[in-house]
């Protein structure tokens, strides 16, 4: 097995910009920005725009779209498609 070919795998803090939530995990990404974590250690921080803390699917605040109008519009538009004239 080759040595020194894999990226550095280290603890990283991800910060959700939408909700302000932060969580510590391990990743190969790196950042020049750092943050002091609850355990007193300093870790690289990666800002993400959306995570499971703020995504509508995971928070239960999703909107259910009424697709009936879209289906009817599609059917009316392509009602005669494929028929010989």
From Swiss-Prot:
Coiled coil: none annotated. InterPro entries: Ribosomal_bL28/bL31-like_sf (IPR034704), Ribosomal_bL31 (IPR002150), Ribosomal_bL31_B (IPR027493), Ribosomal_bL31_sf (IPR042105). GO terms for biological process: translation. Keywords: Ribonucleoprotein, Ribosomal protein. It comes from the Bacteria. One of its GO terms (cellular component) is ribosome. GO terms for molecular function: structural constituent of ribosome. It holds the Pfam family Ribosomal_L31. The keyword Ribosomal protein applies. NCBIfam families: L31, PRK01678.1. Belongs to the bacterial ribosomal protein bL31 family. Type B subfamily. HAMAP family: Ribosomal_bL31_2 (MF_00502). Part of the 50S ribosomal subunit. This is Large ribosomal subunit protein bL31B. It comes from Clavibacter michiganensis subsp. michiganensis (strain NCPPB 382). The lineage of its organism: Bacteria, Bacillati, Actinomycetota, Actinomycetes, Micrococcales. The gene is rpmE2.
């Amino acid at each position: 097995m080759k040595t020194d070919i894999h990226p550095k795998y280290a603890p990283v803090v991800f910060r959700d910009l939408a909700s302000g939530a932060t969580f510590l995990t391990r990743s190969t990404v790196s950042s020049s920005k750092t943050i002091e974590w609850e355990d007193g250690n300093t870790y690289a921080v990666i800002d993400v725009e959306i995570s499971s803390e703020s995504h509508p699917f995971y928070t239960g605040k999703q909107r259910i779209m009424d697709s009936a109008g879209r289906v009817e519009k599609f059917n009316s538009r392509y009602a005669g498609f494929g028929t010989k004239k």
